[in-house]
A protein has these predicted regions:
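Conserved "HGTGT" condensation-loop signature of ketosynthase/thiolase-family condensing enzymes
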Residues: 1-139, 144, 158-161, 177, ...
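Short conserved active-site loop signatures built around small residues
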Residues: 149
Length: 569
């Protein structure tokens, strides 16, 4: 038995519509200023839209980074700021870098969707940023929809606890483009007014762009906030709609609190996803009640920053860190009248309250949920000794490549189909599956879905006993190209929600979770090449943390050709 490692947050910074660093952003929030403004038709949308964009003077700071994309410039500025305030060198072997984003450099796809710029690949974005800081191959990219930032913090915490790294910088970022705004407009989820989370008037979200960075370390002092717990779950309900019960988010909150040894009465406040869409906020209110946290103050920061996608979990955690340190709970800007069926404590005004612990949550497309616990060091629970690593073994493998599906090394299905689309339909039919929704999925989802049909045949687990960890190189680029071509040819108004929902790679995990009722951990990593050993190492950590009996792990990649490797453990 080993002594557990405490993970401290020792530095942070954020760039948003409200300012160039944490101090400026905190000042703006204290003054009840929102970064959400009206943008006329043109740069980010074909129509007038309310959004929170980074101001021109911010980009001036990056003028010497002209060979990097706009998003890469933000990442570099944020990481530089962290390094300038810490004794850390990303070239050191015990230092890691994790980037969280939903769409990365997707704005580059607009001009040449038929021949994508290599920088559109998330792994290439990661490589370029890593090269700038001489971080070598110690960079990871997580694209897990709107929980990406919180997921990245959890992954960083676990790598430090495992001894892989002593310090990790987690940086989350996304910028706005026609690609993103057209998709959300197609879902009719964007409000024509400034969003008002949890309010009876709420009718949608506002999008935003930002980049934030946090330094996590195995060493800290008595003023550094501790990342004391974290967990990820899935609704196993719907790929674009939140759970109607809130149970998936509740599972993540419960596990995060258990890891932190925190009870409901210990929690000072919650910072929730709070997008101001009707169904998200309703779901969160139910999860809060399931977790017994209905008497804990709740707030959302979306009416200040907008929904900043892959940056949101990082930048909102930064604000929570400073709320804990300064004994202030910021109000939910614009909140007036309760608008969710399960009563929760939301208010518009800032207030001073005694602080101990904060719970930060996030939810996203694909049914994913995440929760972390942030703790003042004086209230850190005395952790018990950690368990030794769990013993796992591979019980089955499935691979799909070159119109051939094999299981445990033996071919079980092959086809002379002229293309992947026809092959995968035939492979699915061969399982005896009858889910008509299969035929509406994009090809990446069909690939993963079919592989797991074979993998889990005659195997049964309870929803919280099994998780899924996937990796690929192309993310959702096949469907990204399709969405971009639609709006290029017909305009933003032609964007289809049934296409846009599949422009997130983790949705393949969401489809699998729905089919097999998987509500355990689910995370999607982006890598140029599959590192099976590293994924297995992380799967062991996940299984121990979540008390899982099984975890599907593998490579699920589709770009002109299909390659899928999945393993059940």
């Amino acid at each position: 038995m080993e002594h557990p490692i405490t993970v401290y947050i020792t530095a942070d910074t954020l760039i948003s519509s409200l300012g160039a660093n944490t101090r400026e952003n905190i000042k703006a929030i204290r003054e009840y200023r929102s970064g959400i403004t009206r943008h006329e038709a043109g740069i980010i949308s074909d129509t007038s839209i309310l959004a929170a964009t980074i101001q021109p003077e911010q980009w001036e700071r990056a003028k010497n980074l002209g060979t990097y994309t706009r998003l890469e410039q933000l990442f570099i500025l944020a990481i530089q700021d962290i390094l300038s305030h810490s004794e850390m060198n990303l070239a050191d072997e015990d230092c890691g870098l994790i980037l969280s984003t939903t769409k990365g450099n997707i704005d580059l796809l607009a001009n040449h969707p038929d021949t994508p710029d290599i920088r559109v690949h998330l792994w290439e974005m990661g490589r370029r940023i890593s090269e700038y800081f001489q971080a070598g191959n110690r960079v990871e990219v997580i694209s897990n929809a709107c929980i990406s930032g919180v997921s990245a913090l959890i992954v960083a915490k676990r790598w430090i606890e495992s001894g892989r790294y002593k310090k990790v910088i987690v940086a989350g970022g996304d910028i706005l483009s026609h690609f993103i705004t057209s998709g959300f407009l197609s879902f009719r989820s964007i409000s024509s007014e400034r969003c008002c989370p949890y309010d009876a008037r709420r009718d949608g979200l506002n999008l935003g762009e930002a980049c934030g960075a946090i330094l996590l370390s195995s060493k800290g002092n008595d003023t550094d906030i501790i990342l004391s717990g974290g967990a990820i779950s899935n609704d196993a309900n719907h790929i674009s709609g939140p759970s109607r019960t809130g149970d998936g988010l509740y599972f993540a909150i419960r596990q995060a609190m258990e890891e932190a040894a925190v009870l409901a009465e210990d929690v000072s406040f919650m910072n929730t996803h709070g997008t101001a869409t009707v169904y998200n906020d309703e779901m969160e209110s139910k999860a809060i009640h399931l977790a017994g946290l209905e008497t804990v103050p709740v707030h959302s920061l979306k009416s200040y920053f907008g929904h900043t996608l892959g940056a949101s979990g990082v930048i909102e955690s930064i604000i929570c860190i400073h709320e804990l340190k300064e004994n202030v709970l910021f109000g939910t800007l614009g909140y007036e009248k309760p608008g969710v069926s399960m009563p929760i404590l939301v208010q518009a005004d800032h207030q001073e309250i005694p602080m101990k612990h904060c719970i930060k949550t996030a939810s996203g497309f694909g049914g994913c949920n995440a929760a972390i616990v942030l703790t003042l060091p004086a209230y850190q629970k005395q952790p018990s000794r950690v368990q030794s690593s769990v013993t796992v073994h591979t019980t089955a493998t499935v691979s799909i490549e070159n119109s051939c599906l094999s299981m445990n090394g033996e071919t079980v299905f092959s086809s002379s189909a002229p293309n992947f689309a026809q092959f995968i339909r035939e492979a699915y039919k061969n399982t005896g599956g009858s889910n008509m929704k299969f035929y509406k999925m994009d090809d990446l989802c069909k690939l993963g879905y079919t592989a797991v049909e074979y993998l889990l045949k005659e195997k049964n687990f309870q929803p919280e006993e099994i998780g899924i960890l996937l990796v690929n190189a192309a993310a959702s680029l096949n469907t990204d190209i399709r969405h971009q071509m639609i709006i290029n040819q017909e305009g933003d108004h032609a964007a289809s929600p049934t296409v846009f929902v599949y422009t997130l790679p983790n949705v393949v995990a969401g489809e699998i979770c729905i089919r097999h009722k998987i509500q355990g951990e689910n995370t999607f990593f982006i890598e140029k090449e599959f590192d099976a050993d590293k994924l297995e190492e992380y799967a062991r950590i996940v299984m121990k943390k979540g008390n899982l009996k099984a975890c599907i792990t593998g490579w699920c990649n589709l770009l002109m050709e299909a390659v899928s490797y999945t393993h059940l453990r």
